[in-house]
């Protein structure tokens, strides 16, 4: 029979494709004593970029199907098992999820076409230690789930050299099960991905690289699957995939004296820019309602740090760290502005921006008319604005959740605290109601002046709250906190301590990586 590439896209730990550039490690044609297996060969880190991945070449004497278990060292919950339908005699199996500095055990079970077990076989794979750039991970609140869960960390820590940035995935036991090291990569050796990687629907990863001014799709072995040039413009901060496959990207427009204030849509198939949102036109680039010591506002007046796409009305939501959150239609016209009401005047195209400001409602759905609350000088018992925010996300109910960093809160650095906050927005009536929040009760412990993210985990009705630049006891640390949406009880909490950081940033964000269907 011909070669069968066994696709493991439904589990993070196994994917399509093989590579011949590798280091052999583990059992290589051992004394098999088998009536089924002709040969087994294990190649560790076949691309050179994913040290905890391996490739298994398996040849059999008759047609079989295969089940593989990566045996976890924290009991059965930490196992990764996958069964493969269909039969063949020649396989290339890619394995993801090995432990570093460990003699890993892989259990292979071979079945005939009727599902009868023909043979069980153990294969061992010895791995090197983690590189020195990886952090210490402590589990502060262990999860009680019986499912193996994975957290993708868009990491800013390092030992000696910040670049290339090195994303990693750790499980709920605090073990790093995957990471990328592009130090020897011909194109990504100076990787700066800012917001970092997101997982595409096909299981691959999407990110931008400021060093090459390009967007990339890679697989879990670090192989470039596709790329898109930004045509001389700079990348900063975020790229997301639309439902139709096209890409939305925040860029530095090379033709402008300002930065981080333009969004483009890239046709995924052709690489063409098919739409541009220039915030200099839709907003007021002279507004200085939110001052900062982290940027020159004459150049970096908006600081676009995150995007969200609203499929319901084909509009985009853009977070500007020093302005607020704005929703724009395809013609670059403002639908609403989520920000305190201070100093909103006329846009670059001459439009009065005050008409797009949202009026907060109290718990009884009555408008809050206190001018100090509208201005942001004080908070209302039922409502607070978000400040210098990141990570706007649309929830299944249509509400907007934001990571409210809380920098310069109430213009006096009140707090300090950061929040995950959910707002219900009525675009027609231009009202906003705060319906849920978490983080204020944690105070300075989870305060992150910059970066950070929130995610809503619909399968568990929980929120992942990840302050990435918090400081604990004077030592930079990031927190990964999962809270129950209904009770706000902490379901899981981990602390990430890198050896070194830039601007006290441990990570830009953390994503709960899903198993694919």
Give, region by region, the residue ranges found by the protein language model.
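Sec-dependent bacterial lipoprotein signal peptides
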Residues: 1-17
